[in-house]
Amino acid sequence: PECHTERLSAGDVSEIAENAMPSIVAITNKGVEEVQSMFFGTTQYQETESAGSGVIIAKTDKELLIATNNHVVDGAEELSVCFTVDTENTDDAVVKAQVKGTDSDHDLAVVAVSLSDISEDVQSKLKVAVMGDSDKLKIGNQVIAIGNALGYGQSLTVGYISALNREVTIDNVSNNMIQTDAAINFGNSGGALLDANGNLIGINSAKAADTGVEGMGYAIPI
């Protein structure tokens, strides 16, 4: 039997990206680490900063809930979220966030932002990601990996699903993941893996890419 795989045109990809971008955020994690002074033997503290992407997955009457990788928020003293929408005042795009829940075994975390901290202008432009069903995926389906980590800028790559339920071990914990040849990097880690309809089917994990086959990206199925 013939096997038909829908192929996205450049126009389709642009349209999916345009629809998805308002649900993609940049997350900055500021922490503090101890550093021993070489001269006096005293302990000094040094600020650290790391960045990743996140996906708006729900909106309640009080807050926005954002999915990301656990390693993006791990050890955070201070978290901030930057929304990727055009704003009249650029300061409005960056707000403080709190970790709502973590699952280190699956490298997933949920971050919350109070709606009261987000201007009405920004709120009106944000979108909640449309959930897909990773159980319906087939090898050969086209996918889009999208993210917006600060320091990397907007990152979009297109590829195909290479394998499903691929066992990947990170920090001695094994998980079944979606394997794709779409590049998953620190620019889109924590961001969205979308199907050909623009629905969210996975959360990209650059940490998994470090441990896997070269040229292969991995996403945590949703």
Describe the residue ranges of each PLM region.
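Serine-dependent protease modules
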Residues: 1-222
